[in-house]
C-alpha cells in the first residue's frame, strides 16, 4: 500500500508542515489584522483604516462604500445605568466595566422574554415540508408577491409574526392592523432599528397609534455589534425577511414591504409549509429575545396643535363661526396703573371691532320656514258643523287690524250664530251683527222671529184654507167653556 494511502487512512493530509484550514480553525472566522484595521476605522476614519490594511498586508476585505458606511454608523460605547432613578439612560463605560471579550453571561444565562401577546402551541405533526417559489415580476399563472402576502395575512386565524428590514407599504400595514383589531389575532412585528423612523412616519400618516393598538406588538432588532477597545461600536442590520402565519406557513425571501419592491425591484420568495415552520418558529423567538420595545410615546403639547396631515375645509356658513362660550376677558395684571389702563383700552377696542351683525339664528330660520308653509299651504275647507263654522269665522276676523282684535269675541255675530237664531235657539243680540264680508259671500239677512204652529195631518192635507185654529187657541177656548 502506498504511503499516501496509509496517510489518508490515518487521517493525515499532504503538506503536514502547514496547518489545515477547517471549519473549527480560528483562522477561518477570525483575523487579528482585520480586527486592528476595523478598530482604526471606527476610531480614526478611513485613511487610518487603509493605512492599517497596507501595514498588515491584508486583502481589501471592505469596499470603499462599506468602509464609509461603517465609519458613519460608528458611535460611542454606552451601557445602561444600573441606578434606580436612571433607568433607560446610558453612560460611558469605564475601564473597570469592561467585561470579557469572549463570554457574555447576560446574553447566555438570562431567560428569554415571554411573548407578550401569547403564542399558539401546536405539537401536532405539520406534515411533509413543501416549497413553492414566487417571483417579482410574477410568473405565468402566479400572483404578485404583494398579493400573496395580502392573501395569507387575510387567511391567518391564530398568528401573524413578521421580521422585516424596511416596512413602508401602507396596504400591508392596514392588513395587519385589521387582523389585530377586527379579527383579534396576535400580530408581532420585528423591524430593523435603523429603518424604524420611516415606519413611524408611515403610521402617523395613516393615523395608526402604534402604542395603543391592541394585539399589535412592535419591537426593533439589530444585527451583531462590534465593540472596540477604544469604546467605539458599530451594529449591523437585519437582513432576515420572513412572515410566519399560524405557526405552519412561512413566506421567506428577498422581498421587502416597500412600493419599490412591489413595482420596480426583482425579488423572489418561497412559501414553505410543513415541519420546516418549526425552524422559523424558533428563529423568531431568538430574534424576539434580542429585540427591544419601542420608546415611550411622544408626549403631547399642553397647547392644542393641529395635525400635520391634510386639514378639513372650513365651512362657508356663518353659523360655524359662532362660539357657544363667551370669550374670556384678558386678566388685568397687578403692575403699574398705566399697564392696567392699556389692557382695558385693548379690551374695549376689541369689543368695538367685534362685528355685531351675525347670521340668522336657528330659531329665526325655523320660524320663517313655518310662516312660508302656512301661507303657501292650501286654504282651510269650511265644515258644516257649528264648531268649525265658529272657528272659521274667528280666523277670518282675526286679521283686520289691532282695533278689531281688541273686541270681545262674544259680541261678534258669526254665521254660526245667525244659523242658530234662524233655528230659534238664540245666539246673541241681532243689533251687533257684523257687516263684514264673509269669504263665501255677503252677510246673512236677519230673519224675524215668529211663533211655531203645530199642523195636524188634516190641516197639512187641506193647506192654509183650513178653518181650524191651532192647538194652543183651541185648548184655551175649551178651558173657557
From Swiss-Prot:
Ranges of Polar residues compositional bias? 391-400, 465-474
Q: Determine the domain of life of the protein's source.
A: Eukaryota
Low complexity bias locations: 371-385
An annotated Gene Ontology molecular function: protein kinase binding
What is this protein called in UniProt?
Protein FAM83E
UniProt KW keywords:
Cytoplasm
Family annotation (Pfam families): SACK1
Which residue ranges are recorded for the region named DUF1669? 1-296
Q: What is known of its domains?
A: All members of the FAM83 family of proteins share a conserved N-terminal DUF1669 (domain of unknown function 1669) domain of about 300 amino acids. This domain mediates the interaction with casein kinase 1 (CK1) isoforms. Therefore, it has been proposed to rename DUF1669 the polypeptide anchor of CK1 domain.
Give the protein's biological function.
Answer: May play a role in MAPK signaling.
Q: Give the similarity note.
A: Belongs to the FAM83 family.
Per the UniProt entry, the signal peptide is none
Quaternary state and interactors: Directly interacts (via DUF1669) with CSNK1A1, CSNK1A1L, CSNK1D and CSNK1E. May interact with RAF1.
Q: Where in the cell is it found?
A: Cytoplasm; Cytoplasm, Perinuclear region
Q: Where is this region: Disordered?
A: 351-481
Q: Which residues form a coiled coil?
A: none
Amino acid at each position: 500500500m502506498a504511503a499516501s494511502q496509509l496517510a489518508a487512512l490515518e487521517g493525515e493530509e499532504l503538506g503536514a508542515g502547514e496547518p489545515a484550514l477547517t471549519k473549527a480553525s480560528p483562522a477561518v472566522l477570525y483575523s487579528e489584522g482585520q480586527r486592528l484595521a476595523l478598530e482604526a476605522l471606527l476610531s480614526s476614519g478611513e485613511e487610518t483604516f487603509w493605512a492599517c490594511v497596507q501595514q498588515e498586508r491584508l486583502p481589501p476585505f471592505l469596499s470603499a462604500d462599506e468602509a464609509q458606511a461603517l465609519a458613519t454608523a460608528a458611535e460611542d460605547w454606552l451601557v445602561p445605568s444600573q441606578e434606580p432613578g436612571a433607568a433607560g439612560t446610558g453612560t460611558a463605560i469605564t475601564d473597570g466595566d469592561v467585561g470579557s471579550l469572549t463570554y457574555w453571561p447576560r446574553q447566555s444565562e438570562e431567560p428569554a422574554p415571554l411573548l407578550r401577546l401569547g403564542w399558539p402551541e401546536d405539537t401536532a405533526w405539520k406534515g411533509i415540508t413543501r416549497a413553492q417559489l414566487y417571483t417579482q415580476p410574477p410568473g405565468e399563472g402566479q400572483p404578485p408577491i404583494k398579493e400573496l402576502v395580502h392573501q395569507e395575512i387575510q387567511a391567518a386565524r391564530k398568528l401573524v409574526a413578521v421580521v422585516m428590514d424596511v416596512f413602508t407599504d401602507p396596504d400591508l400595514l392596514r392588513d395587519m392592523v385589521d387582523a389585530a383589531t377586527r379579527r383579534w389575532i396576535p400580530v408581532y412585528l420585528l423591524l430593523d432599528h435603523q429603518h424604524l423612523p420611516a415606519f413611524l412616519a408611515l403610521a402617523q400618516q395613516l393615523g395608526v397609534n402604534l402604542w395603543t393598538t391592541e394585539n399589535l406588538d412592535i419591537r426593533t432588532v439589530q444585527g451583531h455589534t462590534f465593540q472596540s477597545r477604544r469604546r467605539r461600536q458599530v451594529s449591523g442590520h437585519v437582513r432576515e425577511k420572513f412572515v410566519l402565519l399560524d405557526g405552519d406557513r412561512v413566506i421567506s425571501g428577498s422581498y421587502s414591504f416597500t412600493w419599490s419592491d412591489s413595482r420596480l425591484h426583482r425579488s423572489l420568495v418561497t412559501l414553505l409549509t410543513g415541519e420546516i415552520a418549526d425552524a422559523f418558529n424558533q428563529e423568531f423567538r431568538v430574534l424576539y429575545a434580542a429585540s427591544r420595545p419601542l420608546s415611550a410615546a411622544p408626549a403631547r403639547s399642553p397647547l392644542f396643535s393641529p395635525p400635520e396631515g391634510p386639514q378639513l375645509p372650513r365651512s362657508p356658513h356663518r353659523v360655524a363661526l359662532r362660539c357657544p362660550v363667551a370669550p374670556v376677558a384678558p386678566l388685568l395684571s397687578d403692575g403699574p396703573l398705566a399697564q392696567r389702563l392699556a389692557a382695558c383700552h385693548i379690551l374695549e377696542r376689541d369689543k368695538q371691532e367685534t362685528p355685531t351683525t351675525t347670521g340668522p339664528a336657528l330659531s329665526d330660520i325655523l320660524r320663517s320656514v313655518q310662516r312660508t308653509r302656512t301661507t303657501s299651504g292650501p286654504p282651510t275647507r269650511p265644515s258644516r258643523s257649528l264648531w268649525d263654522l265658529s272657528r272659521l269665522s274667528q280666523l277670518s276676523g282675526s286679521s283686520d287690524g289691532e282695533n278689531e282684535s281688541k273686541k270681545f269675541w262674544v259680541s261678534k255675530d258669526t254665521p254660526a250664530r245667525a244659523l242658530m237664531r234662524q233655528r230659534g235657539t238664540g245666539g246673541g243680540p241681532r243689533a251687533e251683527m257684523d257687516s263684514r264680508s264673509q269669504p263665501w259671500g255677503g252677510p246673512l239677512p236677519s230673519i224675524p222671529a215668529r211663533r211655531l204652529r203645530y199642523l195636524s195631518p188634516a190641516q197639512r192635507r187641506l193647506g192654509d184654507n183650513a178653518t181650524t185654529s191651532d192647538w194652543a187657541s183651541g185648548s184655551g177656548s175649551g178651558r173657557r167653556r
